[in-house]
C-alpha cells in the first residue's frame, strides 16, 4: 500500500488526484476460475438441452438434442438471452448443406449448435486465443470431429489475413452474438463472406440500441432485414444478403 501511495504522489503535480483516500480489505480465498460453475445448470431452448459437461442429463430431457458446454475462460454458456435468440434463429435456417461463419465464437456454443442441427462445417473467429482451446474441448465433449469446426484468432473487421482465411462468398449463414456497436461495423464486412441469399444472424443488442442496428442494416444495400426477435431486453436482427 505504501508503494501505491508513493506512486500516486509522484503523479500529483500533473493531475488533480483529490483526497486520494484508501481502503483495504481481505478477500476470501476461493477458486474463482471454477466457482461460477455452481450457477451453470442444464436448461432448454425449445427442443435443445444445453448442459455443462459436469452435469448429468435430467431424465425428463433425455429426448432432446443435447449440447454439452464447458466455456473454460472463453465466453458462452448459452444461458444468456442473446445466445438463446441466436440458437432459435439457427434452428430456422440451418440445413444439411450449411456452411456457417461464427464471428466471436467464444466457447463455440453457436457453431456447435449449428453442427448439431446438421450444418456441414463451421468456421469461427475470435479475438481471444482461449476460444481455440475451448472450442476444441467442447467439440470433443459433443463427439464432433475437430475438422468440422475451424477457429482462428483475429479481427475479421480489419485484419486482412483473417478475412482471407475466412474466404469470400462462401457461407450460407453467418452468426454474431457480440455487441451492437460491433455489429454495426461488422455488417459492412460480412456481405463479402456470405453467398447471395445468405443469412446473417445477430444478437448482443440491448433494446435501446435496436434502432441504431436497424438503421445500419437498412443503409447497407447488400442486406434486407428479414426478422427482428426479442427476449427480455435483448434483440436479434436477422438479415438476408440481396
Language model features: what each stretch is:
Residues 21-23, 49, 121, 148-150, ...:
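Conserved beta-strand segments of alpha/beta enzyme cores
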Residues 1-60:
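N-terminal auxiliary segments of SAM/dcSAM-dependent transferases
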Residues 5, 84-87, 91, 184-188:
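Amphipathic, non-transmembrane alpha-helical secondary structure
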Residues 51-52, 124, 202:
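Hydrophobic residues in well-ordered beta-strands that form the structural core
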Residues 73-156:
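Conserved SAM/SAH cofactor-binding pocket of Class I
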Residues 63-71:
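A short, charged helix-loop
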Residues 127-241:
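S-adenosylmethionine
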